[in-house]
């Protein structure tokens, strides 16, 4: 498959898009050995972390704020994305054996989860901006109802931008094996290939970073007027960590994606360069996937409020079930945890929202 998009990239034996057929047996062999264990690790760690966020929000926090709504939907997006990885891992090691319907279904789930995760990260960034920079306005604007409405709209947008991948993906026999790959009419191939790549780069890198720069610049300006220097320094460090982590995890993939799609314009449309780009795609794509493992840490567990709920959940559901005589760990007062953090000022958002 010589089309490069956000679907996990599997390279087959020959690339016919070159002027002369390009043998890619070695690239496929490396993918078969490298990708399944990496995808498995991403699936395990990402599933555990996001499932913990999901369960805590349902059982402890009860989705009482707009932030909770967005965190809940971010966890769902990451879980949808992650649930497809075992199938892509099998595909990387073998061939596509799940049929055409499942090819389209898993492609759709993968992309909807992928774009949904990006969009909810953007909404969380805007939510923090409103809470800290426009604290008085945020009291009226940041409601559960508004969070639900914007979440529904976000899912609709995520489905819409995923439609081209769902429509064009098809399972068919190519040579001696079955593939799950996009199939365009020959006259449309170049247009859709460029369109998909530019859509990916704009939605997954340029737009999120633009929103982060604008919102976090406003937040930093407000934080520098905060009287509590300790909270200010902690919040500033977290802001830079969020931006740097997102940039480091997704920029390499998007750069390689651009180079691969427009390789003829960079003088890279030869077999050796194509093979190196394919190998780089495998590494950078997996690196980008691991970002969903960090979302629970960056957007949930880093907050003091959420860590208290995690402690309550652990004691109530884990310790109580597996250590019935450990009474010291079961002395939990959930009401106290929820009542400690009821203030809604800008400074409180600095300490708990960030």
Curated annotation (Swiss-Prot):
A lipid is attached at residues 323, 326 (S-palmitoyl cysteine). The chain crosses the membrane at residues 33-60, 71-91, 105-126, 144-168, 201-220, 238-262, 280-303. Residues 1-32, 92-104, 169-200, 263-279 are extracellular. Coiled coil: none annotated. It is a multi-pass membrane protein. One of its GO terms (molecular function) is protein kinase binding. The modification Phosphoserine is found at residues 338-339, 344, 351. One of its GO terms (cellular component) is endosome. It comes from the Eukaryota. Sulfated on at least 2 of the N-terminal tyrosines. Sulfation is required for efficient binding of the chemokines, CCL3 and CCL4. The keyword Lipoprotein applies. Disulfide bonds join 22-271, 103-180. Glycans are attached at residue 6. PROSITE patterns: G_PROTEIN_RECEP_F1_1, G_PROTEIN_RECEP_F1_2. The modification Sulfotyrosine is found at residues 10, 16. It is found in: Cell membrane. Pfam families: 7tm_1. GO terms for biological process: apoptotic process; calcium ion transport; calcium-mediated signaling; cell chemotaxis; cell-cell signaling; cellular response to lipopolysaccharide; cellular response to transforming growth factor beta stimulus; cellular response to tumor necrosis factor. Its main location: membrane. Keywords: Cell membrane, Disulfide bond, G-protein coupled receptor, Glycoprotein, Lipoprotein, Membrane, Palmitate, Phosphoprotein, Receptor, Sulfation, Transducer, Transmembrane, Transmembrane helix. Gene3D superfamilies: Rhodopsin 7-helix transmembrane proteins. Interacts with PRAF2. Efficient ligand binding to CCL3/MIP-1alpha and CCL4/MIP-1beta requires sulfation, O-glycosylation and sialic acid modifications. Glycosylation on Ser-6 is required for efficient binding of CCL4. Interacts with GRK2. Interacts with ARRB1 and ARRB2. Interacts with CNIH4. Interacts with S100A4; this interaction stimulates T-lymphocyte chemotaxis. Receptor for a number of inflammatory CC-chemokines including CCL3/MIP-1-alpha, CCL4/MIP-1-beta and RANTES and subsequently transduces a signal by increasing the intracellular calcium ion level. May play a role in the control of granulocytic lineage proliferation or differentiation. Participates in T-lymphocyte migration to the infection site by acting as a chemotactic receptor. This is C-C chemokine receptor type 5. The lineage of its organism: Eukaryota, Metazoa, Chordata, Craniata, Vertebrata. The gene is Ccr5.
């Amino acid at each position: 498959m010589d089309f490069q998009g956000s679907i996990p990239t599997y390279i087959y034996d020959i690339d016919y898009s070159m002027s002369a057929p390009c043998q890619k047996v070695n690239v496929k062999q490396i993918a078969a050995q490298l990708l399944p264990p990496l995808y498995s690790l991403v699936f395990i760690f990402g599933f555990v972390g996001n499932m913990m966020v999901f369960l805590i929000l349902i059982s402890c926090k009860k989705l009482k704020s707009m932030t909770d709504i967005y965190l809940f939907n971010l966890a769902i997006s990451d879980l949808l994305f992650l649930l497809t990885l075992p199938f892509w891992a099998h595909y990387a090691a073998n061939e596509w054996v799940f049929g055409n319907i499942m090819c389209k279904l898993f492609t759709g789930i993968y992309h909807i989860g992928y774009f949904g995760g990006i969009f909810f990260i953007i909404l969380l960034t805007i939510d923090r901006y409103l809470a800290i920079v426009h604290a008085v306005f945020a009291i009226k604007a940041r409601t559960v109802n508004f969070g639900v409405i914007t979440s529904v709209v976000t899912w609709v947008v995520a489905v819409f931008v995923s439609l081209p991948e769902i429509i064009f993906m098809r399972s068919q026999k190519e040579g001696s094996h079955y593939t799950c790959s996009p199939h365009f009419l020959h006259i449309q191939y170049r247009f859709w290939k460029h369109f998909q790549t530019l859509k990916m780069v704009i939605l997954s890198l340029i737009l999120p970073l633009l929103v982060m720069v604008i919102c976090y610049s406003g937040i930093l300006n407000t934080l520098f007027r905060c009287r509590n220097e300790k909270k200010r320094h902690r919040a500033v460090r977290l802001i830079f960590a969020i931006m740097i982590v997102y940039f480091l995890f997704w920029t390499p993939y998007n750069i390689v994606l651009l180079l691969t799609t427009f390789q003829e314009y960079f003088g890279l449309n030869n077999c050796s360069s194509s093979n190196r780009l394919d190998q780089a795609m495998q590494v950078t794509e997996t690196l980008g996937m691991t970002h969903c493992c960090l979302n629970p840490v960056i957007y949930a567990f880093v907050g003091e409020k959420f860590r208290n709920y995690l402690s309550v959940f652990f004691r109530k559901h884990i310790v109580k079930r597996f250590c019935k005589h450990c009474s010291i760990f079961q002395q939990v007062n959930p009401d106290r945890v929820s009542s400690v953090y009821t203030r809604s000022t800008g400074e409180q958002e600095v300490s708990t929202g960030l």
